Amino acid sequence: MKRRVVVTGIGAVSPIGIGSSNMWENAKVGKLGIDFITQFDTEESKVKIAGEVKGFDPCEIMDKMEARRTARFTQFALYAAEEAFKQSGLDISKEDTLRCGVNVASGIGGLPVIQRECLRGDKHCYDRVSPLFVPSSITNMAAGMIAIKLGFKGSCTCVVTACASASDSIGAAFHYIRDGYSDVMACGGAESCICELGIGGFSSMKALSDSDDPTRASIPFDKERNGFVMGEGSGILILEEYEHAVKRGAKILGEVVGYGASCDANHMTAPLEDGSGAAACMTLAIRDAGIEPCEIGYINAHGTGTPLNDKGETKAVKLAFGEHSKELLISSTKSMTGHLLGASGAIEAVMTIKALEEQFAPPTVGYKVPDENCDLKICPNEGVDFDSEYAMSNSLGFGGHNASLIFKRV
């Protein structure tokens, strides 16, 4: 018999708030976390706007020595993990640590560290790069450091599926508990690659918005959209087997009931134009949850703000939900946070859990010009109340990776 899996802790670091409560309260009122880049001089950069995390101090959770030895994406992950763990109320001394695992994703890992050490090697010699270069930059280090911090000694893995990474991480952790391999999992994602190399790489492939107006840069589903805005941050969830959580008197924030994954198997970066790949993962998630499409009331869309993605995701929703697609409330919180790449699915999972808890769909800010090719029931500029037990969060990534998660209100 498959076991139930619930959420007992959430943590977040995002461009619209440090801490999950701060982030959610700001999301509800449509706070924009997108502004001009401050982390490097953009004079020679075509793209000058991003969703930076402002006011983050890693020394709130670690000493100065550890902060110097740890990449920014890992710092974000550790902060979010600590928040989620504290909220869960878990006492590791009372747990079988081999039944507590970690699955925390990152799409790119410590890219700013790689850039910095490459420049150092070019200037001096490569024997003089930092001895911490490799351990601080590798993508799995956020997961490893969380395991160390929390004392979780079970499975510790890192999913890398581009912008679907965090959703795949949560989905894998969900199945791992449901199928009996673990009782507790810390899962989610972390990303921080707002640097010359990161911005330049995505800019050169015409993926980023080159708008010079922060309020019109990340505009998912708007007819004038012209690319995504890079964001940074982390979202971490503590998942637990239902009876395990009830036995210790944990507060349950929500339930994970479905996960679907598919691949377009079509192109390195472009989604299938007919939306069939993304539709497949939504359908698989619905089937995994054992519910009907009409039972879902809200979708936190992938909604990046690129011309192809939003058009394709619209088609996918229509394929997966049929007539019910006309009734579904849909928003893209990337309009506020920017696109956190491998961490986006985790931040958006937190948003979806909070949306279900409060029965409130956050807005898609900056939405002005409707697009006939994106004719879904978008929540434009203001949030909307809804009444539904179930909500979905979608993530789609380069390489054709598609992931959908379904959460249930408790």
Residue ranges with predicted function:
Residues 1-66, 243-252, 350-364, 408-410:
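ACP-dependent fatty acid/polyketide chain-elongation machinery
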Residues 4-8, 31-36, 213-289, 297-298:
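Condensing-enzyme catalytic core mediating Claisen C-C bond formation in acyl metabolism
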Residues 7, 22-23, 31-161, 190-199, ...:
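Conserved beta-ketoacyl condensing-enzyme motif
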Residues 9, 27, 81, 102, ...:
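Conserved small-residue
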Residues 77-90, 139-150, 156-191, 229-250, ...:
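Active-site-proximal alpha-helical scaffold in enzymes
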Residues 84-96, 245-250, 282-298, 320-324:
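Phosphate/pyrophosphate-binding loops at sites that engage ATP/ADP/AMP, CoA/4′-phosphopantetheine
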Residues 123-130, 171, 175, 192-247, ...:
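Glycine-/small-residue-rich "gating" segment that lines the acyl/pantetheine channel
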Residues 266-275, 304-321, 340-347, 380:
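Short glycine/threonine-rich loop-to-helix capping motif typified by GTGT followed
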